A protein has these predicted regions:
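Electrostatic cytochrome c docking/interface patches
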Residues: 15-31, 42, 46-51, 104, ...
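Axial heme c-ligation environment in periplasmic c-type cytochrome domains
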Residues: 47-54, 69-104, 108
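Sequence context surrounding c-type heme c attachment/ligation sites in exported
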Residues: 26-37, 54, 58-63
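Short hydrophobic/aromatic segments of transmembrane alpha-helices and their interfaces
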Residues: 43-44, 64, 76
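Bacterial N-terminal signal peptides
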Residues: 7-17
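Positively charged n-region of N-terminal signal peptides that target proteins for export
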Residues: 1-6
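Short acidic-aromatic loop segments in the C-terminal HATPase_c
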Residues: 37-40, 66, 73
Length: 108
């Protein structure tokens, strides 16, 4: 009985982790429009001195946002990115990564 209970806990834990880490693309797009679009442009296409961030792997986007959230400087706009990333939760980072992975800018 203990083994069955243990396996159930492990299974639900794994499912929870995957559901959180998968990210919600729609929520990510909303958060992107709220916090990121002014510098990185429509669908993360990049603008002026701000890099293109769309089409990157989820692991890359997640790692970069977590690095900035932790206050670590990486590039020329690090102070701004640190300020923008510090309030992000793990779920918001996963959502942003899910959105940006497949975001495509379409010319109007």
């Amino acid at each position: 009985m203990r083994t069955l209970r243990f396996l159930a806990v492990v299974l639900f834990s794994v499912l929870f982790v995957f559901s959180v880490s998968a990210g919600d693309r729609v929520a990510g797009e909303a958060r992107y429009k709220q916090s990121c679009i002014n510098c990185h442009g429509m669908a993360g296409k990049g603008a002026a001195s701000y890099p293109k961030i769309s089409g990157k792997e989820v692991s890359y986007i997640t790692a970069m946002l977590e690095t900035y959230r932790d206050g670590i400087e990486v590039g020329p706009n690090s102070s701004l990115m640190i300020m923008m990333a510090q309030p992000l939760t793990d779920v918001e980072i996963a959502n942003l990564a899910a959105y940006l992975k497949d975001a495509v800018y379409q010319q109007p």
